[in-house]
Amino acid sequence: IDTFGDVSVRSRSDVNILAVVNTKTKHIQLINTPRDYYIEHPKSNGVKDKLTHAGLYGVENSIGALENLYGVKINYYVRMNFSGFEDIIDAMGGIDVYSDKDFTVEPVKHYTVGVNHLSGIEALAFARERHAFAAGDIQRGQNQMKVIIAMINKLSSKDVLYNYSNVLDGIAGTFQTDMASDDIYTLVKKQLVDNTKYTIDSYSVTGTGDSCTTYSTPKTKVWVMQPNMDEVEHAKGLINSVLSE
């Protein structure tokens, strides 16, 4: 969510990534949905709204919006804000992120093409920047996926897994999840026994810019993204493919 400080507050969702995980085949498919996607959510009474606005009505509402869009049941969620994002990455000792662009975010860091080792604040700046790119929000979405992939790779490494309880203690209160601690422990134990790396694929749906009123702004037109439904259908196929492996 697009706030610092207390993670429990209701706020707009800044990044919306659906992770489809098959623990048997060690395959993860990430689906990124732009925050300005113009879709319905459970609280919008059939009126379209920005996906980011869904979070104003609770995390369950954001989950419902993505479930409706992709026709899939979401079993668990992880919710964090900017502060928690920075804290988690710092607790892991930083992450290694590949950049396909050379750019600078003042006054944080200059990012070079190739692998960049990033602290929490540097990873956040990398994930949020869009003005440096001709593709704008599309490139930002791709960079956000790269950060998530780097986080998954670091979290599934032996160095972190062997110390996962210390890592969790260090980031307590920086994120919210409905996954029980026993379920987290089971996943950690399984990964320690079979340290095969996960294959991680990513896909971002896009759309066309438009100006429309929304459920949350009924009297004011705002910039939205009309979904490319062919890409949404392709994303559905990717999701079902991983689940059926």
Please place each PLM-identified region on the residue numbering.
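Non-catalytic, solvent-exposed segments at the cell envelope interface
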Residues: I1-E245
